[in-house]
């Protein structure tokens, strides 16, 4: 990955995962732990740095896939860190890096595959699946829970990988946390997805990425339970029962209207442009439209009451 999406080593607290429990129920402490793991996947250009952070978190690293482009046309890519410990195995995918060409190809290859998946996302998971499959089969305690997570593109890849992992031997519990994830497949994938009760889709404010690919045309659907907080708000509780129609929100037009109204309120309060986080990407995002600002990882950390 590039400097735009990385954090300094000292920004990763040693106690980041101390609130984690290997539960399939939604919990804010688990969401915070998954957000830290999602951020860690952005560090795959620095294997030693990732290993150092995992050591501090009392986790091992059974598998690591850096950001070298995969072979084949069009280029496909996925960056993955598999970690183990604390009673679970974690599979975390990196999101899109603005400076990484193959990520843009993955994102925009939105033609649906024969099995009703976003082709770019499905191809990226296929590229790394043998490594993930081996890590699952060889995890320290057979049958221990699997947690899949990722921000942005990483969340979409986490959903598709979790759906595959659920069919592996000795996999009883699979939990998914995503942050600002796009839609991943059509109605057939939605209807066959068996992890809806343990898939938690967090959306910050008017984040534009969960609105794409559009629900129409193409019949793209979200899966799992939606947890959304307002712009500049906080995630503060468990998701309620959500209908299939509501779960496919947000809509890009509704989001654009909400973002515009929020910008008007912010302008009136003299806070339209504000510091978001410590990275170059965060500083750039401060001047971008709200639907983009709400997507950056720093704003998900803030919404989870984590100070970077």
Protein language model regions, located:
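Non-catalytic, mobile gating and regulatory segments of ester bond hydrolases
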Residues: 1-149, 153-308
């Amino acid at each position: 990955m590039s400097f735009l999406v990385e954090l300094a080593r000292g920004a990763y607290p040693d106690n980041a995962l101390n609130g984690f429990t290997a539960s399939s129920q939604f919990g804010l402490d688990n969401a915070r732990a998954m957000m830290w793991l999602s951020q860690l996947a952005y560090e795959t250009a620095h294997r030693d740095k990732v290993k150092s952070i995992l050591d501090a978190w009392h986790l091992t690293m059974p598998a690591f896939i850096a950001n070298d482009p995969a072979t084949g046309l069009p280029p496909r890519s996925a960056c993955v860190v598999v970690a183990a410990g604390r009673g679970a195995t974690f599979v975390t995918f990196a999101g899109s890096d603005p400076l990484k060409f193959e990520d843009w190809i993955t994102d925009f290859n939105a033609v649906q595959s024969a099995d009703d998946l976003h082709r770019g996302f499905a191809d990226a998971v296929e590229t790394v699946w043998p490594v993930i499959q081996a890590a699952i089969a060889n995890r320290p305690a057979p049958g221990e829970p699997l947690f899949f997570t990722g921000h942005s593109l990483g969340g979409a890849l986490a959903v598709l990988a979790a759906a595959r992992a659920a069919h592996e031997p000795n996999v009883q519990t699979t939990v998914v946390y995503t942050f600002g994830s796009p839609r991943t497949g059509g109605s057939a994938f939605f209807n066959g997805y068996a992890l809806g009760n343990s898939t938690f889709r967090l959306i910050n404010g008017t984040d534009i990425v969960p609105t794409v690919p559009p629900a129409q045309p193409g019949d793209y659907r979200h899966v799992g339970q939606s947890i959304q907080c307002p712009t500049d708000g906080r995630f503060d509780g468990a998701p309620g029962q959500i209908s299939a129609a509501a779960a496919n929100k947000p809509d890009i037009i509704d989001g654009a209207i909400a973002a515009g109204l929020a910008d008007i309120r912010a302008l009136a309060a003299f806070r339209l442009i504000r510091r978001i986080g410590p990275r170059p990407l965060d500083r750039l995002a401060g001047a971008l439209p709200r639907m983009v600002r709400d997507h950056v990882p720093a704003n998900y950390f803030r919404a989870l009451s984590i100070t970077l």
